[in-house]
Amino acid sequence: MVDGFARRDFLKAASLTAAAPLLSVTAREAMAAPQAVAPSGLLPFGLSEVALTEGVFSKKRDLVLAYARGYDVNRLLQVFRANAGLDTLGAIAPGGWEGLDGEANGNLRGHFTGHFLSMLAQAYGSTGDPVYLEKIRTMLGAFVECRAALRRDPQVLSVPGKSGRAVEQVRGSYQYIDLPAEPLPAMFTFTAWVRPSHDANWARIFDFGNDNTRYLYLAARNGSGVPRFAITTNGPGGEQGINGTAPLPLHEWSHVAVTIAGSTGTLYVNGVQVGTNTAMSLNPAALGSLAHHWLGRSHFGGDPVFAGALDDVNLFSRALSADEVTASLKGDLSSYPFDETTGGTLADASGRGRHATLRRTWGGPSHPGFLAAYPETQFITLETMTRPDYQVVWAPYYTAHKILKGLVDAYRNTQDARALDLADGLCDWMFSRLGKLPAEVRQRMWGIFSSGEYGGIVEAIVDLHTITGKHLELARLFDLDSLITACAENRDVLEGLHANQHIPIFTGLLRLYEATGEQRYWLAARNFWGMVVPPRMFSIGGTSTGEFWKARNVVAGGLSDTSAETCCAHNLLKLSRQLFLHEQSPKYFDYYERTLYNQVLGSKQDRADPELPLMTYFVDLTPGGVRDFTPKQGTTCCEGTGMESATKYQDSVYFRAADDSRLYVNLYSPSVLKWKGVTITQTTGFPVEQGTTLRITGRARFDLSLRVPAWAGEFTVTVNGVPQHVNALPGTYVTLSRSWRNGDVVRVRMPFGLRAEHTPDQPLVQSLMYGPINLVARDARRELLELGLYGRAALSGDLAGNLQPVAGSPLHFRLGEVALAPFFEGTEDAYHSYFRRAEPKIVFAGVDSGVANPVRADGSTFLDEVWVAAPFSSRSAFLDRVTAVARRWVGEGLMSVADHDRVIRTARSAPMR
């Protein structure tokens, strides 16, 4: 097993460049001369260097690994093989977005396969289990085969026929048979054996014509599902037709024939006349010379290509009789037994030399590096689009990113040269297209909602650049200048934008900054993060409503059943991680912890399924919402990023200084790190346990920096039982500098407190956080619950006195009559992430003053003003605060003197601790 790519690549970058200077965030300074910039002396560890041990993360991960182990990757490869015209090995593509029948005609197919490859690569990098390696090798082998097939002209896929062999046209191959065009006679017969494999309406068995006005065709199914022959010189409105009476059965051979003699046309199925038209004024000769004689392709671009097998196609210059139709006669115009087993030329057995050619509707790739599960047409069409239409073009470069990332991840973790070659070729192909486009065309493309979305492709390209030294110019072709400039100038332009279309752009900009030193990339990424966290952040760490951003500081107004698209959380974690490598601000890992322990963990249902990853797409944040773990049949973007998240939970637990002088402990997660000859074992039940233990095996000198979470009111450290005098301020790191010896033990204690976080737009709409954990109310009611919390508040401001633990259920509590549970539990219980704060009376430590809690015009209350000053150093300090606030409210006419006196007496008698 090969160590993770991240460490190796960052080492390479660090050896080539100097550490970054301390940067400000003013756009003016972005004019500095660009040069490559390594992260500020800080490096991540590879997946193989950090092993998860038993805990909440390993349990979720193991569910995903079970899915990865059991799922047949040939099902995912089906659409790639079909697109290349290859045998799909009997595999059935998954449903949802990854198949041809998915949303928008399957225009996003291939993206989930890329996610799956990344998951396998990370699983192998983490565990070394050969089952994942074999699946990776199968996928890479198929990709190589598909790319080779796309590079050449279509080749016949020979299958057993009705007699001898037949030609199979795989659904999704976009292949058809091109017969030599020639004028047709007035009398005419077409016969063929057909075996449809799909029930798409209007797929043609044959279509001879010039365009969509002058043609004759036989469709396997019309709009009513039965065969139809038609001829016209004036488009659909002028068609003279014959309809069958019953559908052609799927996966069975049927004999079809059309005869035309004089004014009579007849349609036969299996030798039986199923339709006739005796009033036809048109015949094939009346159409004159036609440009195209196609088998399987329509002159209407929106019609599907015929999927199935064709055998014994014959064209006659006379109308066969009913008895002759099913006889084994050879057409005098042309005759195709389709007995070929190789090549792309199909011989004419009539003796006239009218040999046919297998072709693709879209021709073929513009560059040999092209690899996709669909034709190149989406990429071509995007270049002239001016408005979004995902039914026509759905984020082709987004799908290309998933495939590219999967290939890069596969190379990172296996060193399989095929993955590198495929990734390199894919980038060469992209540059061959994008490099020719004017800048204004690219800017228009990248600004189109959905169609122009390209995900994290820049990050993947720069990752590949660190290996090959190539493709940096390609990465810069994805610059969306209007967005970069606005964010570099710290202008918030996010309202109304599609969140996940834009979040991964900024991780790519950070990677470009590292490669080029261009500070506008750094400024844009750093400033963008602050536009989302916290102004557009839900308490679970996610962002977006219905996939889009609302105005800054609109959070309560964004609570819906389509809140917090899970991809957004995944990509914000990647951005936060990368920002921390440059700027060791604890805020990035405070956010990382919040999002990882809540939305990301909670996005995985707590059960296994052999067919589905069981991940959320949206998070329902409405009162009484229920999480949907099977959105859109299980192959969406969010299920893809969910699989990736679950197989790299450990990638940010620890970071190290590039000179190995310091180890950062960013997350408190049970794990084992092997580094510089030392093994560090972190043992914890966090977040059930409110602390952690680190044991050192081996000897080394280094600084150990421990993150003090922003929520931690208390944080104590001992080494070998000896208390350490550290200035553990919330939202910082504390550092222990020493020569570590074998057997040293570091223990950290960080008691959780309960706090209520209010939304900026509706302060009374709040959520409960217990340490880093979002506690949700398990309740099916569909209106916001009203909860009061001040009545049991401690001098520290901790609200945990309101909670009654549920025996035998860690992190489960009762708050009065309301049951609370951690959001990260992946259940289908109805829940409330938010509630309405209601403090009708002034109560201290359970003692009721009998005084109503007065409210200012802005909605803030007397108790709010008291408790905003917490923590209180002593009971005396608390009494001083109550007295001062009461006096002020009396002075402002908001409280009577009598109520003032009752409040003061209650505060003095209350058993505050």
Task: Cite the ranges covered by each PLM segment.
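Extracytoplasmic low-complexity segments
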Residues: E145-G172, F208-D211, G275-G288, A322-G364
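N-terminal secretory signal peptides and thylakoid transit peptides that target proteins
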Residues: M1-A18
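Trp-centered recognition loops
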Residues: W193, A246-A257, Y733, R741-G743
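Extracellular glycan-recognition modules
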Residues: D153-G164, V170-I231, G237, L250, ...
